[in-house]
Amino acid sequence: MFIDLALIYYVSVNPADWDDCIGQLLTELTGVGRLVCFIDTYRKTPCTFYFLIYSITNILYLIINLTSRIVSVGYGIDLTRTSIIWCKTRQYFLIILSLISFTCSWLSSVDQYFVTSRHANLRRMSNIKWTHRIVFLLILVSCLHGIPCLIIFNISSITNQCINSNIIYAIYSPIYSLTFTCFGPSLIMILFGYLTIRNIHLTRVLVQQHIDRQLIKMTLFQVILIAVFVTPYSINVVYILITNGMIKDTNRLIIENSIFTILTLLTYVYYSGSCYIFLISSSRFRRTVKEKIFNWRKPNQINPIQQPTI
């Protein structure tokens, strides 16, 4: 029992040794695969455009979050403790990128519900022009929503850590997290994932072609991804809020901290696992990735122009 608690304690007090290295590895592995999201053919439908924005924000989130933590652990350079600018901007970008990522996830599931609907009015709501406007509005609102982070986050003179110095925001933060980046997206994606499957069973012949059926599979796999790797973290946040005022012994605190660390690690899989989900669920995605990689490796060739002889 003592050995188990000692191991758990090590994990809880050294989370970066586990989650940062694994997360950075996943980032590097998925970087090549996600390049396919920038191909023109994957930007012409609402769902794939949501996937594009989702992939970009996930990459940026992992780069900003994990790189700074790895530098802090590996080289002892923690800019959040020494630079007030980085303390504020890091929190700012993390909050807006996570909001955009989760919102694009559930918007893609809503779009697939519209696409598979038997009602023409609902199918018309899947419109690329409206999608561009929604994404623009989402980015604008997310940037405005993150502004308080630039004001209230400061380096504590006591602990020398980058912390929130506003009591009201400390109350708002877990509520926001549960609503917009935890339970909210999970419930919406599960609901519309079920409705999409229901539409498919009710409709013998889909209006869309095979590529759209593959998009449906990709979206449903997204539902599984967020349900498996984000929902447990959401439940743990609720548990922490409920038991916040309770008196806990050292062993319980060690176990709770280790569980929180492990579940936080699982959320990194959400940010880095989308490429693998797309590769598993879509043969077209796999084929396009393969073609794109091999095309990059082929040198450009110029065919000589033969002049007609007189």
What are these regions, as identified by a protein language model?
Residues V223-V238, S258-Q307:
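Seventh transmembrane helix
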Residues N58, T89, D111, F136-L140, ...:
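Generic structural signal for small/hydrophobic residues in well-ordered secondary structure
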Residues Q24, E28-T30, C47-L107, I171, ...:
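Extracellular TM2-ECL1-early TM3 structural module of rhodopsin-like
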